[in-house]
Structure formats: C-alpha cells, structure tokens
Amino acid sequence: MAILSSFGGIIPRVAWHTLPLTSATVAHDVKLRNGKLEAWRERLAVGTATTDAKCVWYHGCCYYTFDKCVDMAEYVTDYGRLYFTGREDYPEVAKIGDNCALTYYRLGVPKPTSVLTVSGTSSTGRNCASRSYVYTYVNVFGEEGAPSLPSESITVADGTAVTITGFTIPDATYGVTAINIYRTATSWTEGNEKVQETNTDYLLVETIPISTSSYIDNILEKNLGEAITTEYNREPPENLREIRYLRGTGVLTGVTTNQVHFSKAYQPSNWSSEYDLTLPYNIVNIQTLGNKLFVSTDGYPYVIDGAQKCEPRQCRGVSEVFTPLPDISCGHVNSSVATPFGMIYSSKDGLVLVSPDAKFQLITSAWFSTDDWIKIRPDTVRLAYWRGYVICATDVITFMLEIDSGVYNDATGANLVTLSDEPVALTTTQSGELIMLEGNILWQWNAGKSFRKYIWTSRELNFGGESTPTTAKVRTDGITVSLIDSDNSHVFERFVPDETPIRLKRLGRHRNWRLSFTGTGSVDYAALGIRYDTLERNKLNGTKI
C-alpha cells in the first residue's frame, strides 16, 4: 500500500525516481500552504491598462500603467507627490490631483544660464557700497534652485534705483513660477576691530513672477531678506533611472551607469554632487528596504547605508558581497524585488537573495541546477513578493516559490509550484494584494469568485512489478483521480466525490505508478492498495509517503 499523507511541490533538478517522498512530478496552479492540496481562486479583473503596457504601479487605490519601462517612487505622504524615471528622458515629479490624475514636472530646479545686467547712477562715499546680483528659479512646489553667475558690480548709494534685466525663462517642463533676486550685502563694522573680518552674503531682494523681464531695485539694505542657501543645489542627472525612496529618511535615490545618486533629506529636488557614490561595476538594479539600499551590478552586489544621519558620502557605509553574482536581467522594471529579507534578483545560477548584512543565498539552488535555470530564460525574469511567496515569471515559465513559511504558518515548508499566468509585469498594492498585468488587463491574484483548476501528480510509487493496485481511497470533497503507469499513459481516471474507497480496473503490472489529481476540490490524504477491504475498513498498514 502507498499512502500520501502530505503533499509537496516539484524539484526540477531531481530525477523522478529519487524525489523526496512528498514531492510531485507536476504541481500546477495548486495551493500547498496547509499541507494538503487546495485550489487558488481565479484572478479578478480590476482595471484596464494602456495599450501595449509594460509596467504597472499602485499608489493607494490609484494605478498607473505605461507602455515603456517606468519606475515610480512614493515619497513622504503629506507631500502629495510621486516620482518617476523612464517616462521621459529625464526624471519627473508628479502632483496627485483629483481622481488619481497626475500633473508631471521635470524633477529639480535648473540653474539660470544667463547673467543679469544691472544699470544705475554710480556713487561714491560712506553711504555707498559695491554690489552684484544673482537670481534663482522657484518652482510650483516652492523649491529653489542654484543661483546664476553674479552680475558685474555696481557701486551705488543705499536706496538708489538699480535696473535689473536679463532674466531668462527655463523650459516649461520644470514648472518654474517665480524668480528670487539676491544682491550682495556686507556686514557693518565699527572699524576698530583687531582683525578685519568682512562677511558678504547674497540677501533676498524680491520674489517676482517668472514672466518679469526687468526689475527696479530701490530697497534699503536694512529691508533685505534672508541669505541665499542654495549655492550648492543641483538638479538630478538627466539620465537618472530606478528612482527609489529610502523610507524614513526623506531621501530619494537613483542611479546612472555606475553611480548612485541621493537627494538631500526632505529636499527631493536637490541632488548635490557631494552625495554621489561611484561603484566599479555597471549598475543593473536597485531596491530599498527601510534605509538600506541594495544594488546589483554586472559584477558584485552591494548594500549601502542610507540612514538619515548620514550627510556627506563618506558617512554612507558601502558593503560589498564578496562573491561575483552578476545580475543578468535585461532591464525589466520588475527584474528585482524587495522582500522582508532583502533584495532578490536573477543571476546565471538562480535567484539571489542579498540580505541587509551583505550576505547572499541562492534561493532556487535546491530546485534548479544551473543547467535547469538557464533553460527557463532567467534574463527575462519578472519578480514579485506576496505573502511569503516569490512569484517569478519569465518568457518560458511562471512559478511561485515559498520562502517564508513560518510567518504564514505553513505546515510543509518551501514548495515550488508552476502557474498558468503569463504576466508582463507584477506589483503589490499598499494593502498587500498581488496585481498582474497581462493582456492589457490588471488582474488581482486569488480574488475571483470561482476556484482555479489545479493539477498535482505524485512521485513514482513503487509496487516492484509484483503487484498491481486495485483500489484507492482519497479524503476529498470532490476531485478527479488519475493513475499514470511507468509508460506515462493515463490508464485510469474517475471523479471521486468523497473518501469512500473506489475499485480500479485491471491495470497490468508495472514497476511504478503515479497518482494524479485534477480539479478544484481539496485533498487531505490518498492511498493506493491491493485489497479493497483494507481501505474500506481504513486499515492503513502500508508504506506511509
């Protein structure tokens, strides 16, 4: 007698005849989390994507799809903004409006390219001072950019009118609405100081509309505003990609070729060059987990500390994983994923998990050999993490691998199951729902009204060729049972409504058999025997599988 009292997933790298006792040769669309066979619910259509969509992002109940590879970063909640790279040739910030509508602006505030021209009546004397002017741009969010180069100096008496011209208007994509004008002012001294210290700053003269072509400055020095603070501000690199938010820090991050860039904390438009980090390899993917930044490259992976207390780049710790694990993905938006355990991405040997302490693990090595892995086109991988499962889709196969059984009280541990879905992209919502983009439709996984039909086929059950099973018993609420011989022929099939034993037809002698289940009902237990009365009286004195 062969008894199946628990059910596992497939292990492609292991020959059928050497599979562990609970493993399967086919486990397709089946739920194994509770130690028995159960059906997932069908997907639920929850939205329509743009034509030829390649990615999808959720923000609360709002979703956004794009026909190119676009990355989106959420930011501090009360800012009411989202940040994007890949939609245009430059990074963007979007203001969230009514009904999820987005108004896009180019991220950053540019430095003016023109130098102001100043004119007025020059004077000399104790009440006169030499001054020069600069100006900055201010955008719709009140963010200010770096100043222009200073104008030529002019010496005038305090309060004398100075005409200022030469303002230029930046590209409309920046959303600049105003100009700040600054002029130099020197602190007053009595003249009897032992050490002469002259403090000269640019102080605010006036904020004017962006459309202003000229301005007359006759403001007294005592009425000037605050000193300029944006001398070292820099807009993000034009080719920035993979924008992410380091949660809890107020810092955005993104990459170019082999450089990692950071914004100043709570200044998302200011990407000062002092924060730039250069790595020795080309960057492929990045992910964030809290204030940790994970970086995969075409060489070694890295973990970077992006904590809020870190100001200059020297303070950001960079840890290298001292094993070459090149990321081979071809640049899909979902070709890496952040999980509670770290970042997962695709290498030539399998899925790599890099933990926050810069340790790594090949999490698919127990299921896929390197040769098996290469066959499924891992360079085309799309990944998601959902309730303890890693969902992996390639151009060849889609599967789910459980990596966190403890949190979700799984009785059987990690299992690998193939899926019918062929998503172009995947994402998870803030409420933890898995969304698949397929056929320009957004599908919510495991949310439909009906159940999905599954197939599960056991390992080879060895009867030694000396006997043939004549009866079967399945504890189920309704499932189709099939028996497959050693020639891979389906020699018996029948719908079984309950656990009443059934008789099998004459099957002939084979060395082994595989028991298969198809349908939507649950299966707690199954047994193959050679005597009907043994199963009828539930005398399970055979080999437990």
Sequence positions of predicted segments:
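Short secondary-structure subsegments characteristic of cysteine-rich extracellular domains
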Residues: R316-A338
